[in-house]
């Protein structure tokens, strides 16, 4: 990175996962992943190279899902309460050089696949999109007793409805959790769900953004300190992959953070205990009480509105009044 922080350097594309509850592999302190630093690095590239003006057919983009698509883990410090995330980056890239491009994001943190179906599909259809991204089911699969086949059947009905728009539909599969000590045991369930996602995509002529194969996401720097959401760097990396899946040119170069300092086994276990106390146990407690991090949250971009480069209208994730 050429900015003042010096936290990032530009890397090369290395080997080629997201839901509210996809914990990170061994996330630690010392990740150089602040939203401000990543945004500064992205602006450096644009100022040096000029904006890429890609050629693509889309003018109305609607993003659906949970916290992954809302952008949790990537707060926008210029707009309190707003989270940028990979979908905003994709919209920004698509808007460059595209007259009358408009974007809506209906995703809400904590949503299960049935809630996404019931709350987001009908509004999405009313917005008449020509590009739809959908990531749903991760929160269902990770739960004890979660059935990847039943979850995929719900996904299939959702994609069938969305396909009536004639829009390009991009689905996301889940991450490889092999390196994750907390949920590594459900790797098989995630793999089954991922194969089901591919089957659904093939049935409805959708494309798949392959997070399982995005090996960079096994690095702790790609994750927020809660180990449940992606960091700004993670969202940046996923946006690059999504744009390349759509075969769209962009300015999102690989960013290479400084390595995380090595820690002793004892230090790592202390961090695990602190993480469990502050993040894992509260997450479990909410589920036991039937609560969600998304209770009372509204979509950050409920209307399909224009983008002007990287700027966006005010809004995002407000709390509903009782």
Identify the role of each PLM range:
Residues 2-109, 121-128:
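Serine-esterase "nucleophile elbow" of acetyl-processing enzymes
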Residues 2-47, 54-57, 203, 226-229, ...:
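Conserved catalytic region of serine esterases and O-acyltransferases that act on ester linkages
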Residues 63, 134, 170-172:
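Structural beta-sheet core signal
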Residues 70-76, 99, 113-150, 177:
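Oxyanion-hole/transition-state-stabilizing segment in secreted/luminal serine hydrolases
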Residues 75-81, 146-149, 184-188, 224-225:
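Short glycine-enriched, charge-decorated loop/helix-capping segments at active-site entrances
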Residues 148-156, 187-194:
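Charged helix-capping and loop-helix junction motifs
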Residues 164-169, 206:
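A short helix->loop->beta-strand "cap" motif at the edges of active sites that frequently abuts
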Residues 179-212, 232-235:
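Substrate-gating cap/lid alpha-helix
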């Amino acid at each position: 990175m050429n900015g003042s922080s010096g936290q990032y350097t530009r890397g090369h594309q290395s080997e080629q996962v997201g839901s509210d509850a996809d914990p990170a592999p061994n996330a630690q302190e010392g990740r150089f992943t602040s939203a401000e630093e990543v945004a500064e690095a992205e602006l450096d590239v644009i100022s040096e190279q000029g904006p890429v003006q890609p050629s693509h057919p889309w003018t109305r983009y609607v993003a659906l899902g949970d916290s992954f698509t809302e952008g949790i883990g990537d707060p926008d410090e210029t707009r309190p309460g707003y989270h940028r995330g990979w979908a905003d980056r994709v919209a920004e890239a698509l808007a460059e050089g595209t007259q009358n491009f408009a974007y809506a994001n209906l995703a809400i943190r904590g949503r299960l696949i049935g809630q996404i179906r019931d709350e987001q599909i009908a509004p999405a259809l009313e917005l008449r999109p020509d590009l739809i991204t959908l990531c749903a089911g991760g929160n269902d699969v990770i739960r004890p007793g979660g059935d990847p086949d039943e979850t995929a059947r719900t996904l299939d009905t959702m994609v069938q409805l969305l396909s009536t728009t004639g829009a390009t539909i991009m689905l996301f599969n889940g991450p490889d959790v092999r390196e994750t000590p907390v949920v590594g045991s459900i790797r098989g369930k995630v793999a089954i769900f991922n194969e089901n996602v591919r089957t659904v995509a093939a049935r409805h002529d959708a494309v798949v953004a392959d997070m399982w194969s995005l090996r960079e996401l096994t690095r702790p720097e790609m994750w927020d300190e809660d180990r449940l959401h992606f960091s700004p760097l993670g969202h940046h990396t996923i946006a690059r992959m999504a744009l390349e899946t759509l075969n769209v040119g962009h300015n999102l170069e690989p960013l290479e953070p400084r390595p995380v300092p090595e820690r002793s086994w004892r230090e790592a276990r202390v961090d695990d205990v602190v993480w469990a106390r502050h993040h894992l146990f509260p997450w479990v407690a909410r589920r036991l009480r039937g609560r969600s991090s998304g209770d009372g949250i509204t979509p950050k971009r409920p209307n399909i509105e224009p983008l002007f480069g990287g700027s966006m209208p005010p809004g995002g994730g407000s709390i509903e009044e009782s």
